[in-house]
Amino acid sequence: MLYPELLQDEYCRDTLRMIKASLEKEAHAGRLDIAGKYTFLIPDMYAFCQWLFLGNKDPSGLLENGEVYCRLFEGGKELDCLRSPHLYLEHAVRRNMAGVNDEAKRWFQTNGIYTSCHDLITKILQNDCDGDKALVVEDVGVVEAAKRNTKGIVPLYYEMAKAGAKPLTPENIYSSMIAAFVGGNIGAISNQITKIWNSGTVDNLDAVKLLCLENNFTIDQSVA
C-alpha cells in the first residue's frame, strides 16, 4: 500500500468496513459477479423497413437466424440472452454480429440488443418490443451452462387474451390505472417458482411451466 497511514484514518476505516460488509452480504445472497449488462430488446428495423416501404412480405433483414447485434460486447462471440429474473428456462444463446456486419453497424446505432426477424428469440424470452429489457451475458461459463441446461427444452407458448379496444376517455384511463394497481401482483407467483427451484429436487417442471404461464398472464392481464 502506498500510504499505510491512511488505514489509521477513521473515515477510511469506516469506508473499508462498509465495503467489506457489502461484499459479505452479496456473497451470502448467492449473487454471481458475471460479465453482463441490461439492455433493451429491439427488432431488426432494416427488415421492418423492407416490409413497410418495399412491400416485402418475407424481408431478409440484416441478421440471420441465431444472430443478434449488440455493440456493448465483442463481435463474433456467443451471448446468453435472458430475462432477469427469469422464471423457467428462458435462455437464448446467440452469436453477436457487432463489428462483423458493416451495414448492420450503419443501421443499429444504439446500445440495445437487436434480434433477427428469422429467430424465435421473442418466443423464448416472452418479450414484446415496447421497452422490454434483457440481461445479456458474455461470461463463457454462463453461456456454456445455458447451452447445456436448455438442450431439448422448447419455448413455452400459449395464446394470451387481449383487451378490447376502447376510446381514450378520462373514465377509461382511470379504470385502467385502478386495474393496474389492484392486479398485476406477480410477487407471490414468482416466489412459488423460486421455492421450487431452490428445493434441490425439481421433479415436476410442469408446475414451473404453469406458474410461469400464470405469472405472464398476470403481468399482461387484460383490462376489459
Protein language model annotation of sequence segments:
Residues 1-224:
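Core catalytic machinery and nucleic-acid-binding channels of phosphodiester-processing enzymes
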